[in-house]
From Swiss-Prot:
Residues 12-85 are annotated as: Repeat 1. Repressor of strigolactones (SL) signaling. Subjected to a negative feedback control of SL signaling. Residues 645-654 have a biased composition (Basic and acidic residues). This is Protein DWARF 53-LIKE. Residues 8-180 form the Clp R domain. The gene is D53-L. Polyubiquitinated. Strigolactone, but not karrikin, triggers rapid SCF(D3)-dependent degradation via the proteasome. Residues 102-180 are annotated as: Repeat 2. InterPro entries: Clp_N_dom_sf, Clp_R_dom, P-loop_NTPase, SL_signaling_regulator. Belongs to the ClpA/ClpB family.
Amino acid sequence: MPTPVAAARQCLSPAAVPALDAAVASARRRAHAQTTSLHLISSLLAPPAPPLLRDALARARSAAYSPRVQLKALDLCFAVSLDRLPSVSASSSSGAADEPPVSNSLMAAIKRSQANQRRNPDTFHFYHQAATAQTPAAVKVELSHLVLAILDDPVVSRVFAEAGFRSGDIKLAILRPAPPMPLLGRLPTRTRPPPLFLCSFAAADDADVPSPAGNLAGAGEENCRRIAEILSRGRNPMLVGVGAASAADDFAAASPYRIIHVDPNTIDRSDLGVAAAMASATSGLIISIGDLKQLVPDEDAEAQENGRRVVAEVTRVLEAHSKVGRVWVMGWSATYETYLAFLSKFPLVDKDWDLQLLPITAVHAAPAAAGPAAAGGLMPPATTVAAFSKPAASLMDSFVPFGGFLCDNYEENSLTANSCPQALRCQQCNDKYEQEVATIISASGITAEDHHQGGLPSLLQNGSMMGPNNGFDPVKVRDDRMVLNSKILNLQKKWNEYCLRLHQDCQRINRDPYKPFPRYIGVPADKERSANPSKGSESIGVQKDVIKPCAVSAVHSSSTARPISSPSVTNKRNEDLVLNLQARHSKSDENLQERGMQSQHGTLSNADNPDDHASPSSAAPVETDLVLCTPRDCSSKGSSSTCSKRVEDSERSVHLVPKKVDDLNLKHPQLSVQPNSCSWSSINVGKTSHSTLHSVASGGFSAFGQWQKRSPLAAQNSDLSNYKLLVERLFKVVGRQEEAVSAICESIVRCRSTESRRGPSRNDIWLCFHGSDSMAKKRIAVALAELMHGSKENLIYLDLNLQDWDDSSFRGKTGIDCIVEQLSKKRRSVLFLDNIDRADCLVQDSLSDAIKSGRFQDMRGKVVDINDSIVVLSRSMIHGSKNGLEEGLSFSEEKILATRGHRLKILVEPGRAITSGCPSGKVVVSPRHFLTKIQASLCSGSISKRKLSMSDDQEKLQESPSSLKRLHRTSSIPFDLNLPVDEDEPFDADDDSSSHENSYGNTEKSIDALLHSVDGSINFKPFDFDKLADDMLQEFSNILRKNLGAECMLEIDVGAMEQILAAAWKSEDKGPVQTWLEQVFARSLDELKLKYKHVSSSTLRLVPCEDTLPTVKGDGLGVLLPPRIILDC
């Protein structure tokens, strides 16, 4: 029996009565027989209604679709549902009351709301005393309680589900509204508000929460409120828009914090560090970097260097005071293009600074709703009857503030306002988080190459067609891409908090709070699951050469990938404990338990895609179960599958020029590696018997794109795991060793995407590089340090083949002591241990223990954890081979490494004939008495592959005492000085030889056991120095023919040739050597032509002098190639 409207109106509070009146008016206008829950919810969605439900929807969106499409679909779904209700004739509808009565379902919801309010702990005594009146109006239903009860109506829940919403999420957003004041400071435990129960939501609205930002209420600026909310969550705002500068000035005038303006030209490192150190004792510090345009100048080299110095210094200060949490950074830009250029130049600041983009589309924001509680825009507008006096408008008008950018974050839907200090999730919650992230990526619809509504149901596609021109809207795509990052972060925080609240006894996965956005990719994890390929999501486009999320999945994917690292989270305590009611698919968990989840990994997400799982985009109603305090979610299917292409085997690079692996439309600056410069202060590649522990210098910014990741290590910015992108970046740095680079990337992706075989809490990766080409190994290590940990300074290098360390800083220390000392300074780094097979037994035993335990321990008992680090073990011997020497090559890496820089001299010998090489050869390599007589010739017309041979006499000559001594010195014989010496034992040559062999055999077994425990073993091919020598001879021939004619011949001493090859090998490409040939060698030939008349018919000899070149500090090849060649006529 329907209830008269007057009777229902008596049960409602004054704030809820206008909502009922608006619903009755809507039913009367549509000629419906009764006023239902659909009418009431539809009236609350109209712009004139109180913003309670609209704000909850903005925070509780499932984020499966773009904001415009989903909200337009919700408006359409309610319109269609209301049109389906039966209408009555005009004669029957004209009655005395002329008001459609309240339906039974709506009245039942009102009764349930009364019961919930009656059980409210805050008002229990009041209603208990009022219960003696025995009147139905003893409990006046508030609007929030009424909406919560209506959301339990199956009809209403089905309509929300058709638009992609879940009733449980909407309830949670209503129960946990946004705080009335921005909490800019982290509240101590004693002052946090009381917990929020299902029926005590009024406490959250009226709680007196102390805040240091109280004076911001008088600023009257909406932009100040938005900036304050970002700071309260521990993020760093970056203002973009025409009014960004004025908004920053307004906030600086009203902020209680100390604000330091950083000038790139006059930045003072000491002042900034002192101010940041005092931030913990004050209200806080905000570092203002000003306009981003001054950090990204066009062509001014000095201004660019100043910008790099500012970014490096601000990054250092933020990292040093990350635990204190009272230091922020803020900047602004008038155009979005400048912001993109800033991210392109400094791609890692988005992660390191934890930036949040804040669009400012007007110089001054519009004032908040009228009412004393809404002054300054810091309080939500009051619910009044006048709010319903305006005519109804489209639902979208209220959901797209600030020129179409939806700035409300999903974060308010979480259990607490901020994440815990360290993001922890169990495997179950992590899997469900990855499902939601994959749903966002696969259905976000922001790519320009495919239709943005391809994965949506027909109802949502119809809603999206209402946009301008009934097609693709680039403005909408830009806005959706801007808000995608904040969605991922808020989802991550939500699941972290769920897991901490509900799964306290489960084993958790430790996530680093300082890693970027997640990237996921499927890789073969084990043989049993590798046969099931996974479906990848559509890629998200690249804009303005800034590395944006790009979905790439592997052909063979297996178990659920673990994220790599989580973004920075704040230390604010949990404020509320709420009751979570969330719909789930009834068969979803059964499918996850019965069979292995198939992973779909994108750059920003990782989600499992069982084939029989229902898609959340389905418009049909689904059977749901309401589960108390158990977060559930449904799995989703990828919208389309893309297979990542492996790097094809290509011809070995001799010119050291990077090859194009697979075009991703990405432009990365080249990483400059100068082995003999101060940036490699401790890696002197020219010395094989002496090395030091070092850290590579850095300019303060990365040469690579932003490496986003996240959750067990990371991918809370995403699994690090974009295989294709990682291969391309490493290959651009190395320029050769295609197979080794591919194997390294595959090992890293596998370790990041699957659970470590050493346990779920282990995130360290152990790799072993076999073979020669030490320069390629070191360049890869430098690139990994920058890609994985943000800076080349995070590389630790140690050569374990040290018989004596001359450096005073190493005196009295063992190799393990140096490793522990450096790892204690750089907990997240790449540890490169060279010549592992020549290390002493103590170091090898310590490494074996470190692989098992995940920590190093020095001789004094100091322990350092290696979690999140990459340990690279290097040896010259190729895996599976008994020796690592290059066979059949004229120039070996050992000789090139031993080369020192000598002065060069040109000798003129008239009429001397060249007896070696091809008959027409004009440039040859001549022998020298103490080296093998290697003769290589190059015809001036064409290049032919030289087949060099070595005679038996030359082989015997090579076996010199010095070489035998060197081989004996580098043998891996454990010699422990801590063992006692038995002086009475007679020396026996046979016994000593036998013990020598036994010790060597034990050492080899220990090394083999150590190398079998690593995550990946990679073989490096020997560098083809002979081919490089051919190219160098061709360059000499061209210059010789150009300056002295075709009749002149040149002999290059083998020592001089090794010196030139060493310079070319250690440089990034042939550019520096080519410049030396064109400027130094060619100039010497011109001088020789002036001094010697018959030089064109003579034979020239380029030989090295005995005196070495002076040591040159800084970049360049001055230690190998002289700036001037001596002429001896």
